[in-house]
Amino acid sequence: MRRFLTLLLFLALAALSASAQMVQDASYRVVGHIKSDGTIQDASYRVIGHIASNGTIQDASYRTVGHLERNGTVEDASYRIVGHIKPDGVILDSSYRILGHVKTDGTVQDASYRVIGHVKGIPMEWAALYFFFR
């Protein structure tokens, strides 16, 4: 289940982009697709979730699994704060420990600066969700 949520929320990063987007892992393998209507698909185009324009992330059954607030606060489905996204791309957990980084070019890095994915043309805040729901 945790792996499912990780993939779902990583894919949700791109959901509100103008057109469908591909999400890639560190080796540039496609791990999913996002349609312009907010439908999230895995690499085989199977629907695994949805994203609403208000930042609510849902699984394929429309159960809410998380929220991204406008101020950068990240919450789980029960609205418990699980972390923070700083404007410079630094991702912090609820205890303010660094979890990772999102670069302006779409590169996603872990806390040790190892590349773990690529999300071109996607807002940094959405890319940062990966760290909270994996």
What is each PLM-predicted segment?
Residues 2-8, 12-47, 53-55, 61-64, ...:
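Long terminal segments
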